[in-house]
Amino acid sequence: MRAIVLDVDDTYRVTELDEPAPGPGEVAVRVAYAGIQWGDTMVEDGIFPVPRPFVPGFEASGHIAAVGAGVDEGRIGEPVAALVPGGAFAEVVVVPAVLALAAGDVPLPVAAGFGWGTPTAYDLVNTAARVGEGESVLIHAAAGAVGTLAAQFARLAGAGRVVGVAGSPARAGYAAAFGFDQVLLRGEFPAGLGAERFDVVLDPVGGRTRRESLRVLAPHGRLVAYGSIDGGEPVLADADELLMSGRSLLTWNSNLLSRTHPERLAGSARRALGLLAGGLIRVDVTAEYDPADLGLAVGRLRAGVTHGKSVLRVAGRLGSRP
Protein backbone atom coordinates (compact mmCIF):
# COMPACT_ATOMS: atom_id res chain seq x y z
CA MET A 1 0.00 0.00 0.00
CA ARG A 2 0.99 3.64 -0.25
CA ALA A 3 1.21 5.90 2.77
CA ILE A 4 2.39 9.34 3.81
CA VAL A 5 5.34 9.27 6.20
CA LEU A 6 6.79 12.10 8.26
CA ASP A 7 10.52 11.64 7.74
CA VAL A 8 13.52 12.51 9.89
CA ASP A 9 13.98 15.77 7.96
CA ASP A 10 10.46 16.97 8.94
CA THR A 11 9.07 16.49 5.44
CA TYR A 12 6.08 14.42 4.36
CA ARG A 13 6.65 11.83 1.65
CA VAL A 14 4.47 9.25 -0.08
CA THR A 15 6.07 5.83 0.08
CA GLU A 16 5.26 2.15 -0.42
CA LEU A 17 4.73 0.06 2.73
CA ASP A 18 3.45 -3.42 3.49
CA GLU A 19 -0.30 -3.43 3.95
CA PRO A 20 -1.11 -4.09 7.62
CA ALA A 21 -3.26 -7.07 8.61
CA PRO A 22 -5.69 -6.87 11.52
CA GLY A 23 -4.90 -8.87 14.64
CA PRO A 24 -7.39 -10.23 17.17
CA GLY A 25 -10.06 -7.64 17.97
CA GLU A 26 -8.95 -5.36 15.14
CA VAL A 27 -10.22 -4.31 11.72
CA ALA A 28 -8.43 -3.01 8.64
CA VAL A 29 -10.03 0.11 7.18
CA ARG A 30 -9.52 1.17 3.58
CA VAL A 31 -9.20 4.91 4.12
CA ALA A 32 -11.27 7.39 2.14
CA TYR A 33 -10.58 10.53 4.21
CA ALA A 34 -8.45 11.29 7.25
CA GLY A 35 -9.05 14.02 9.80
CA ILE A 36 -6.34 16.59 10.55
CA GLN A 37 -6.08 17.41 14.24
CA TRP A 38 -3.87 18.94 16.92
CA GLY A 39 -2.06 15.65 17.51
CA ASP A 40 -0.56 16.00 14.03
CA THR A 41 1.13 19.25 15.05
CA MET A 42 2.47 17.57 18.18
CA VAL A 43 3.99 14.75 16.12
CA GLU A 44 5.61 17.29 13.78
CA ASP A 45 6.98 19.28 16.72
CA GLY A 46 8.38 16.22 18.51
CA ILE A 47 6.05 16.57 21.50
CA PHE A 48 4.83 13.05 20.71
CA PRO A 49 8.22 11.25 20.57
CA VAL A 50 7.59 8.71 17.81
CA PRO A 51 10.32 7.00 15.77
CA ARG A 52 10.63 8.34 12.23
CA PRO A 53 9.76 7.72 9.47
CA PHE A 54 6.25 7.61 10.96
CA VAL A 55 2.82 7.38 9.33
CA PRO A 56 0.76 10.08 11.09
CA GLY A 57 -2.99 10.51 11.16
CA PHE A 58 -5.33 9.74 14.04
CA GLU A 59 -8.77 9.96 12.44
CA ALA A 60 -10.11 8.06 9.44
CA SER A 61 -13.23 7.25 7.51
CA GLY A 62 -13.66 4.53 4.94
CA HIS A 63 -14.84 0.94 4.69
CA ILE A 64 -13.77 -2.13 6.65
CA ALA A 65 -11.65 -4.28 4.33
CA ALA A 66 -10.73 -7.14 6.68
CA VAL A 67 -11.34 -8.26 10.26
CA GLY A 68 -9.18 -10.03 12.80
CA ALA A 69 -10.03 -12.96 15.04
CA GLY A 70 -13.05 -12.35 17.24
CA VAL A 71 -14.59 -9.68 15.00
CA ASP A 72 -17.83 -10.29 13.11
CA GLU A 73 -17.03 -10.92 9.44
CA GLY A 74 -20.34 -9.26 8.62
CA ARG A 75 -18.64 -5.93 9.28
CA ILE A 76 -16.57 -6.24 6.10
CA GLY A 77 -17.67 -3.47 3.75
CA GLU A 78 -19.18 -1.39 6.56
CA PRO A 79 -18.60 2.39 6.35
CA VAL A 80 -16.93 3.61 9.54
CA ALA A 81 -15.60 6.60 11.43
CA ALA A 82 -12.42 5.34 13.08
CA LEU A 83 -10.43 6.64 16.06
CA VAL A 84 -6.91 5.61 15.15
CA PRO A 85 -3.75 5.27 17.30
CA GLY A 86 -1.73 6.44 14.28
CA GLY A 87 -1.33 5.59 10.61
CA ALA A 88 -4.50 7.11 9.12
CA PHE A 89 -2.60 8.93 6.34
CA ALA A 90 -2.40 5.69 4.37
CA GLU A 91 -4.49 3.59 2.03
CA VAL A 92 -5.17 1.07 4.81
CA VAL A 93 -5.03 1.45 8.59
CA VAL A 94 -5.59 -1.08 11.37
CA VAL A 95 -7.72 0.02 14.31
CA PRO A 96 -9.33 -1.65 17.34
CA ALA A 97 -12.74 -2.87 16.20
CA VAL A 98 -14.46 -1.14 19.11
CA LEU A 99 -13.15 2.23 17.87
CA ALA A 100 -14.31 1.70 14.28
CA LEU A 101 -17.80 3.14 14.57
CA ALA A 102 -20.56 2.32 12.10
CA ALA A 103 -21.04 5.55 10.14
CA GLY A 104 -24.29 4.64 8.42
CA ASP A 105 -25.36 7.40 6.04
CA VAL A 106 -22.96 10.02 7.43
CA PRO A 107 -20.88 11.29 4.45
CA LEU A 108 -17.30 10.03 4.57
CA PRO A 109 -15.67 13.51 4.75
CA VAL A 110 -17.87 14.29 7.76
CA ALA A 111 -17.18 10.86 9.29
CA ALA A 112 -13.45 11.64 9.11
CA GLY A 113 -14.08 15.06 10.61
CA PHE A 114 -16.03 13.40 13.44
CA GLY A 115 -12.68 12.09 14.69
CA TRP A 116 -11.56 12.42 18.28
CA GLY A 117 -12.99 15.92 18.61
CA THR A 118 -16.65 14.93 18.67
CA PRO A 119 -16.52 12.31 21.44
CA THR A 120 -14.10 14.57 23.33
CA ALA A 121 -16.58 17.45 23.20
CA TYR A 122 -19.41 15.10 24.19
CA ASP A 123 -17.49 13.83 27.22
CA LEU A 124 -16.28 17.29 28.27
CA VAL A 125 -19.89 18.44 28.54
CA ASN A 126 -21.66 15.28 29.69
CA THR A 127 -19.08 13.16 31.54
CA ALA A 128 -16.47 15.53 33.00
CA ALA A 129 -18.33 18.82 33.57
CA ARG A 130 -21.84 17.28 33.73
CA VAL A 131 -23.46 20.45 32.43
CA GLY A 132 -26.94 20.81 33.89
CA GLU A 133 -30.14 22.63 33.05
CA GLY A 134 -29.72 26.40 33.10
CA GLU A 135 -25.97 26.38 33.81
CA SER A 136 -23.54 28.82 32.19
CA VAL A 137 -20.61 27.55 30.13
CA LEU A 138 -17.45 29.32 28.91
CA ILE A 139 -15.59 27.63 26.03
CA HIS A 140 -12.06 28.57 24.98
CA ALA A 141 -10.87 27.91 21.39
CA ALA A 142 -14.51 28.38 20.44
CA ALA A 143 -13.98 28.25 16.66
CA GLY A 144 -12.15 24.93 16.65
CA ALA A 145 -13.67 21.52 16.05
CA VAL A 146 -14.01 20.73 19.77
CA GLY A 147 -15.20 24.23 20.66
CA THR A 148 -18.01 24.36 18.10
CA LEU A 149 -19.16 20.87 19.09
CA ALA A 150 -18.95 21.57 22.82
CA ALA A 151 -21.28 24.54 22.36
CA GLN A 152 -23.79 22.32 20.58
CA PHE A 153 -23.59 19.60 23.24
CA ALA A 154 -23.94 22.21 26.00
CA ARG A 155 -27.15 23.45 24.39
CA LEU A 156 -28.48 19.90 24.17
CA ALA A 157 -27.63 19.45 27.87
CA GLY A 158 -29.79 22.46 28.73
CA ALA A 159 -27.15 25.14 29.30
CA GLY A 160 -28.73 28.53 29.88
CA ARG A 161 -25.84 30.65 28.59
CA VAL A 162 -22.86 29.67 26.43
CA VAL A 163 -19.97 32.09 25.87
CA GLY A 164 -16.93 31.47 23.68
CA VAL A 165 -13.44 32.90 23.36
CA ALA A 166 -11.77 32.96 19.92
CA GLY A 167 -8.50 34.20 18.50
CA SER A 168 -9.65 36.63 15.80
CA PRO A 169 -12.75 38.52 14.66
CA ALA A 170 -13.16 36.10 11.75
CA ARG A 171 -13.00 33.08 14.05
CA ALA A 172 -15.38 34.72 16.52
CA GLY A 173 -17.86 35.38 13.73
CA TYR A 174 -17.59 31.79 12.57
CA ALA A 175 -18.13 30.38 16.07
CA ALA A 176 -21.24 32.47 16.62
CA ALA A 177 -23.24 30.16 14.35
CA PHE A 178 -22.87 27.18 16.71
CA GLY A 179 -25.06 28.19 19.62
CA PHE A 180 -22.93 30.74 21.46
CA ASP A 181 -24.72 33.68 23.07
CA GLN A 182 -21.52 35.74 22.88
CA VAL A 183 -18.00 35.22 21.56
CA LEU A 184 -15.14 37.29 22.97
CA LEU A 185 -11.75 37.82 21.38
CA ARG A 186 -8.83 36.28 23.23
CA GLY A 187 -7.50 39.74 24.10
CA GLU A 188 -10.84 40.63 25.69
CA PHE A 189 -10.68 37.74 28.15
CA PRO A 190 -11.32 38.08 31.05
CA ALA A 191 -11.98 41.85 31.22
CA GLY A 192 -14.78 41.64 28.66
CA LEU A 193 -16.79 39.42 31.00
CA GLY A 194 -17.08 42.06 33.70
CA ALA A 195 -18.30 40.40 36.88
CA GLU A 196 -19.86 37.39 35.11
CA ARG A 197 -19.02 33.99 36.55
CA PHE A 198 -19.52 30.54 35.01
CA ASP A 199 -20.61 27.15 36.23
CA VAL A 200 -18.37 25.41 33.69
CA VAL A 201 -15.21 26.43 31.80
CA LEU A 202 -13.69 24.20 29.09
CA ASP A 203 -10.01 25.01 28.51
CA PRO A 204 -7.54 23.46 26.04
CA VAL A 205 -5.19 26.46 26.20
CA GLY A 206 -3.47 26.44 29.59
CA GLY A 207 -1.05 29.04 30.96
CA ARG A 208 -2.49 32.48 31.67
CA THR A 209 -5.85 31.45 30.20
CA ARG A 210 -6.19 28.65 32.74
CA ARG A 211 -5.24 30.87 35.67
CA GLU A 212 -7.78 33.51 34.64
CA SER A 213 -10.39 30.83 33.99
CA LEU A 214 -10.15 29.62 37.58
CA ARG A 215 -10.95 33.17 38.66
CA VAL A 216 -14.16 33.34 36.61
CA LEU A 217 -15.62 30.14 38.07
CA ALA A 218 -18.83 30.53 40.04
CA PRO A 219 -19.21 28.78 43.41
CA HIS A 220 -19.37 25.02 42.73
CA GLY A 221 -18.04 25.70 39.21
CA ARG A 222 -15.97 23.18 37.27
CA LEU A 223 -12.99 23.95 35.05
CA VAL A 224 -12.11 21.07 32.72
CA ALA A 225 -8.58 21.19 31.26
CA TYR A 226 -8.16 19.03 28.17
CA GLY A 227 -4.99 20.38 26.59
CA SER A 228 -2.18 22.92 26.89
CA ILE A 229 -1.96 24.58 23.49
CA ASP A 230 -0.23 27.59 25.05
CA GLY A 231 2.64 25.42 26.25
CA GLY A 232 3.34 27.89 29.03
CA GLU A 233 4.05 27.40 32.71
CA PRO A 234 2.09 24.76 34.61
CA VAL A 235 -0.84 26.22 36.52
CA LEU A 236 -0.83 25.60 40.26
CA ALA A 237 -4.16 25.56 42.08
CA ASP A 238 -4.67 25.88 45.84
CA ALA A 239 -6.90 22.98 46.86
CA ASP A 240 -7.94 24.68 50.09
CA GLU A 241 -8.99 27.82 48.22
CA LEU A 242 -11.01 25.75 45.75
CA LEU A 243 -12.57 23.82 48.63
CA MET A 244 -13.91 26.94 50.33
CA SER A 245 -15.89 27.91 47.21
CA GLY A 246 -16.73 24.38 46.09
CA ARG A 247 -14.92 24.89 42.79
CA SER A 248 -13.21 22.02 40.95
CA LEU A 249 -10.28 21.71 38.53
CA LEU A 250 -10.79 18.59 36.41
CA THR A 251 -8.97 17.06 33.44
CA TRP A 252 -10.05 15.00 30.45
CA ASN A 253 -7.83 12.87 28.20
CA SER A 254 -9.62 10.95 25.44
CA ASN A 255 -6.37 9.44 24.15
CA LEU A 256 -5.65 7.89 27.55
CA LEU A 257 -9.25 6.69 27.81
CA SER A 258 -8.88 4.88 24.47
CA ARG A 259 -6.08 2.79 25.98
CA THR A 260 -7.44 2.23 29.48
CA HIS A 261 -11.20 2.00 28.88
CA PRO A 262 -11.81 1.88 25.10
CA GLU A 263 -15.41 0.71 25.48
CA ARG A 264 -16.22 3.81 27.54
CA LEU A 265 -14.85 6.06 24.81
CA ALA A 266 -16.66 4.03 22.17
CA GLY A 267 -19.94 4.41 24.06
CA SER A 268 -19.64 8.19 24.11
CA ALA A 269 -18.57 8.20 20.47
CA ARG A 270 -21.58 6.11 19.44
CA ARG A 271 -23.95 8.44 21.28
CA ALA A 272 -22.34 11.47 19.64
CA LEU A 273 -22.46 9.81 16.23
CA GLY A 274 -26.15 9.11 16.74
CA LEU A 275 -26.75 12.80 17.43
CA LEU A 276 -24.80 13.69 14.29
CA ALA A 277 -26.72 11.19 12.15
CA GLY A 278 -29.98 12.52 13.59
CA GLY A 279 -29.16 16.10 12.64
CA LEU A 280 -29.00 17.34 16.24
CA ILE A 281 -25.37 18.43 15.91
CA ARG A 282 -23.14 19.18 12.95
CA VAL A 283 -19.47 18.57 12.25
CA ASP A 284 -18.40 21.42 9.99
CA VAL A 285 -15.76 20.30 7.49
CA THR A 286 -14.42 23.61 6.21
CA ALA A 287 -11.37 22.44 4.22
CA GLU A 288 -10.33 19.38 2.22
CA TYR A 289 -6.65 18.95 1.32
CA ASP A 290 -4.75 16.71 -1.08
CA PRO A 291 -1.71 14.79 0.23
CA ALA A 292 0.73 17.24 -1.39
CA ASP A 293 -0.67 19.98 0.86
CA LEU A 294 -0.57 18.08 4.16
CA GLY A 295 2.32 20.15 5.52
CA LEU A 296 0.40 23.33 4.69
CA ALA A 297 -2.72 21.99 6.40
CA VAL A 298 -0.91 21.09 9.61
CA GLY A 299 0.91 24.42 9.58
CA ARG A 300 -2.33 26.35 9.22
CA LEU A 301 -3.80 24.45 12.16
CA ARG A 302 -0.74 25.21 14.29
CA ALA A 303 -0.89 28.91 13.36
CA GLY A 304 -4.50 29.16 14.51
CA VAL A 305 -5.83 30.38 11.17
CA THR A 306 -8.25 27.51 10.62
CA HIS A 307 -11.77 27.05 11.89
CA GLY A 308 -14.05 24.04 11.99
CA LYS A 309 -12.52 20.80 10.74
CA SER A 310 -9.97 20.04 8.02
CA VAL A 311 -9.70 16.64 6.34
CA LEU A 312 -7.25 14.95 3.98
CA ARG A 313 -8.42 13.24 0.80
CA VAL A 314 -6.78 9.81 0.76
CA ALA A 315 -8.62 7.38 -1.54
CA GLY A 316 -7.16 7.61 -5.04
CA ARG A 317 -4.88 10.50 -4.07
CA LEU A 318 -1.62 8.79 -3.08
CA GLY A 319 -0.48 8.07 -6.63
CA SER A 320 0.00 4.83 -8.49
CA ARG A 321 2.26 2.05 -7.37
CA PRO A 322 5.65 1.78 -9.10
PLM feature segments, named:
Residues 187-196:
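Short amphipathic alpha-helix with an adjacent loop that forms part of the alpha/beta core around
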Residues 44, 61-85:
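A glycine-/small-residue-rich N-terminal strand-loop-strand element
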Residues 9-11, 17-61:
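N-terminal glycine-rich beta->alpha transition that marks the start or flank
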